[in-house]
């Protein structure tokens, strides 16, 4: 009986601490919100996000401060970030690489490295001419008033510290993130 009790307790705590693999995020840059979704159902909405200083759209080069449109996954989670928590996205995607290669922004070797990383479910190179280190993060010690007034990131999506702490309970590496 004790064994069953311990098994049930361990199962419950393992389940409670693990994010649902069917949950995904829709980042609506125009509406400045993130919808936490399961299938087509919206479970909750995080409002008043900030995006890159350059707005949102097609990133063309490192340092353009644009939040990229596209479909990504959370590739890694930095629990001890200067922005409180950092959910690194698998940017650039294979589609980003294809567009950049066609436009002559990246060479064939860079294109191949990005595509191969995605084929093997690895994090794509973060040091290409397209940039990298795009993610969802909190404020850390940044000024909440600036966050509420301006788009201030270098291309990331920023939430308040309370929001990022809450979101960290709902997502994990592998969570799909669609940015539009």
Regions found by a protein language model. Give the residues of each.
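Positively charged n-region of N-terminal signal peptides that target proteins for export
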Residues: 1-4
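N-terminal signal peptide c-region/cleavage motif recognized by signal peptidases
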Residues: 11-16
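A structural motif detector for short, solvent-exposed N-terminal "entry" segments of globular domains
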Residues: 18-55
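Exported/periplasmic cell-wall-interacting domains
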Residues: 20, 66, 76, 80-180
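Well-ordered beta-strand positions in beta-sheet-rich domains
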Residues: 24, 46-48, 71, 86, ...
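Structural motif
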Residues: 31-33, 71, 133
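Short, solvent-exposed loop/turn elements at domain surfaces
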Residues: 35-37, 43, 56-60, 82-84, ...
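Electropositive
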Residues: 44-73
């Amino acid at each position: 009986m004790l064994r069953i009790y311990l098994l049930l307790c361990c199962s419950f705590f393992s389940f409670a601490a693990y994010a649902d693999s069917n949950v995904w995020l829709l980042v609506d840059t125009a509406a400045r919100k993130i919808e936490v979704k399961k299938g087509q159902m919206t479970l909750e909405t995080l409002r008043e996000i900030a995006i890159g200083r350059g707005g949102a759209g097609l990133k063309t080069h490192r340092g353009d401060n644009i939040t990229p449109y596209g479909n990504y996954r959370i590739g890694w989670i930095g629990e001890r970030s200067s922005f409180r928590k950092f959910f690194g996205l698998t940017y650039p995607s294979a589609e980003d690489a294809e567009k950049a290669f066609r436009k002559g922004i990246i060479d064939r070797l860079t294109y191949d490295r990005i595509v191969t990383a995605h084929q093997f479910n690895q994090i794509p190179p973060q040091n290409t001419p397209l940039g990298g280190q795009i993610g969802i993060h909190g404020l850390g010690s940044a000024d909440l008033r600036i966050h509420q007034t301006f788009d201030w990131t270098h291309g990331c999506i920023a939430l308040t510290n309370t929001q990022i702490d809450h979101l960290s309970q709902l997502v994990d590496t592998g969570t799909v993130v669609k940015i539009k």
